[in-house]
Structure formats: C-alpha cells, structure tokens
C-alpha cells in the first residue's frame, strides 16, 4: 500500500515560534512513518518558508528543524505536491499564536484547496482572540469571570478612565493578557495598581488589544475535544502548579507543572465540564481538535477560561496526555487528526460554488 503524503508545517512569525518547533519535534517522532511519507515546512521568524522532504529519522537535535542550510521557496510551489509527486493527503499546521493559529494560514490552505488538520478560519481566529471568544461564550450561555478589554490606542488616550473601570469592575488580583497570544506569553498576575500598569505595558508589547480578567482561587481543569460535527471529549485533567502563576517559563522552561489525569472531581462535575467543552467547541464552529480550559472552585462552581484551537503536543502537554488516558496513543491521535482533516475536506466538496 502506497504511503500517504503528509506535510508538517511549524515555526512561524510569532512569539510562540520556539514552542511550535518543540511541538513539531514531538509529532515528527510519534507519527507513523510506515503509513505516511513526511515532508516538513519550517517558517522562519521572518516569515520565510523552507522545505525538507522525506523525513524518516528520529529528530534528536531540535535545532536541526530550523533548516538553516535550506533555501527559502515559493509558498504555493512548496505546498503543491509532496516528495512522491502526489498532492498532500493533509497538511498538519503545528503553528502557535499569530500568523498560524489565528486563521491566517488556514485561509491560505482554503484558497489552495488543501486538506489540513484542525480548525478552519472562523474557529481558529475566534479561538485566538480572547475577547471575541468570550463574546461567543456569553452568547452560548457559558459562565465566565468578569473581565475588561481595551485597545492600546484607547489606553494611551484614556489611561485614567480605563484604570478606574478596571478598579470599579474587578478586584485584585487580576490577570492581564494580550488578546491574541497563547502559551502564557505576555501575561501578568497583578496585585496592585503599580503591577497592573506594568502588566498592561508588558501585554501591549505583544498585541494592540488586551483582556484583564478577575483572578480567582480555583483549580485549573482542562478537557480535550476531538472530532468534526460529532465531537468526543476526554475525562478532565488538572494542572498542578509548583508556582503561583502558570506562565510561559513555568510551562516550557522550568517544568514546574504536573498534570493530574484524570482530575479528582465528582463525576457530575466531570460530566458538566465535558458537556461545556462540547458547547465551547460548537460556539466557535470548531473542527478537528480543541482544548477547553476551566476554573473549578472548592464549592464546584465552574467558569470557562478559554479554548485553545491548536493545543501543544510537547512532552508536557495536556491534550495528548488526556487522550492517552482514554486509550488513544499519541501516534493514533495524530492518525485520527489526519483522518478528520480528510473528512472535513471531503465534506466541503459537497458545497456548490455556482448557481445553475
């Protein structure tokens, strides 16, 4: 049986560039190379596209994925066919943050009519933008913590009024977040006005829009979702932190987190979380995969925090670990995602693009 052509795309013009490379290393070492002919495309921090074909060896040196000695190519040509000369069965974008997880590259794949793993333009973009995401959750009736959002230009013009709004609506501690970044990049926990001002300036280095959320004493619970029109969910897992704030450094550099899978919760609470994860999946019209993040208080109040349309696949990542607990191996999970991409593309072919 001939191998299917699959292309892994990673890197990207994003502050989460290095996380994407780490994710790509994990996926490349787990994907079934007996079933798939693997090509890779690395997008540099400057936006250049570099391609290497027929990856068969284990990737031990992560820096080799930066393809330093490879010349940049023309995007449409790089994506037009695989190393076997056939079109790709699917492209797997392992891109985190802006210019990759936000609907931009999904739009490119749509225009080129290439099957791709994961969410479409709408779901990717709305899951990336924390404010839009919150508005969609509110429309779906999902419970959330209070928040305030504003633009960089508004803050520079009306700083006093905005700080007053934050103090009127929220209580310390609060979390300041860039609206369009993940992996906890640019996020600050603030306990007073001085920290708030510093956190706002930090967040505005990464985005023109930010969200300030009410802090809460609660457990951080996550649910993985997999599927297209009829998604399945996992039992919830819990993020156990050795630090007060689960930031980028704690996540990816210090390893100061532990995953408790399944989470120690009442079954009724677990089922509520799973149902809410499906509601979040549908609220943003997702396809393929999603990770839904929640807060659960000691008295079992549940608040949805956010969703991640392209969860990490690193050795520390919750998403593949949750599915492994459900009996789905890492390699099989990748296979399922590729099959879902093909299914989504076949479904799209039923659409008419002209009027008879």
Curated annotation (Swiss-Prot):
UniProt keyword ATP-binding present: yes
Pfam family, one: Dala_Dala_lig_C
Domain ATP-grasp span(s) in chain numbering: 134-339
Organism superkingdom: Bacteria
InterPro entries given in the database record: ATP-grasp (IPR011761), ATP_grasp_subdomain_1 (IPR013815), D-Ala_lig_Van_CS (IPR000291), D_ala_D_ala (IPR005905), Dala_Dala_lig_C (IPR011095), Dala_Dala_lig_N (IPR011127), PreATP-grasp_dom_sf (IPR016185)
Cofactor: Mg(2+); Mn(2+)
The keyword Lipid biosynthesis belongs to this UniProt entry's keyword annotation: no
Enzyme class, UniProt record, top EC level: ligase
Reaction(s) this enzyme catalyzes, per UniProt: 2 D-alanine + ATP = D-alanyl-D-alanine + ADP + phosphate + H(+)
Entry GO MF terms: ATP binding; D-alanine-D-alanine ligase activity; metal ion binding
GO biological process: cell wall organization; peptidoglycan biosynthetic process; regulation of cell shape
Gene3D superfamilies in alphabetical order: 3.40.50.20, ATP-grasp fold, A domain, ATP-grasp fold, B domain
EC nos: 6.3.2.4
Function: Cell wall formation.
Family classification: Belongs to the D-alanine--D-alanine ligase family.
The protein, known as: D-alanine--D-alanine ligase
UniProt lineage: Bacteria, Bacillati, Bacillota, Bacilli, Bacillales
């Amino acid at each position: 049986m001939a191998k299917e052509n699959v292309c892994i795309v990673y890197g990207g013009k994003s502050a989460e560039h290095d996380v994407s490379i780490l994710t790509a290393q994990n996926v490349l070492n787990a994907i079934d190379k007996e079933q798939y002919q693997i090509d890779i495309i690395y997008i540099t921090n400057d936006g250049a596209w570099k391609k290497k074909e027929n990856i068969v060896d284990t990737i031990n040196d992560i820096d080799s994925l930066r393809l330093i000695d490879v010349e940049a190519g023309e995007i449409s040509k790089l994506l037009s066919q695989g190393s076997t000369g056939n079109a790709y069965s699917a492209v797997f974008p392992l891109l985190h943050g802006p210019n990759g997880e936000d609907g931009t590259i999904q739009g490119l794949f749509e225009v080129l009519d290439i099957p791709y793993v994961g969410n479409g333009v709408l779901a990717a973009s709305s899951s990336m933008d924390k404010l839009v995401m919150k508005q969609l959750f509110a429309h779906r009736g999902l419970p959330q913590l209070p928040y305030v959002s504003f633009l960089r230009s508004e803050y520079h013009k009306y700083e006093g009024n905005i700080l007053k709004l934050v103090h009127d609506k929220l209580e310390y501690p609060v979390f300041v977040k860039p609206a369009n970044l993940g992996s906890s990049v640019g996020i600050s926990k603030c306990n007073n006005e001085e920290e708030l001002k510093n956190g706002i300036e930090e967040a505005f280095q990464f985005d023109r829009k930010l969200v300030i959320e009410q802090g809460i004493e609660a457990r951080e619970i996550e649910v993985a979702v997999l599927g297209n029109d009829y998604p399945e969910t996992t039992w919830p897992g819990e993020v156990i932190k050795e630090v007060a704030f689960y930031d980028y450094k704690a996540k990816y550099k210090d390893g100061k987190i532990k995953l408790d899978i399944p989470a120690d919760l009442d079954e009724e609470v677990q089922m509520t979380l799973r149902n809410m994860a499906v509601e979040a999946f549908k609220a943003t019209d997702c396809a393929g995969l999603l990770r839904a993040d929640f807060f659960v208080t000691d008295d079992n109040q549940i608040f949805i925090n956010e969703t991640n349309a392209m969860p990490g696949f690193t050795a520390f990542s919750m998403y593949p670990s949750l599915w492994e607990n459900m009996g789905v191996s890492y390699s099989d999970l990748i296979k399922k995602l590729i099959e879902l991409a093909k299914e989504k593309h076949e479904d799209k072919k039923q659409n008419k693009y002209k009027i008879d």
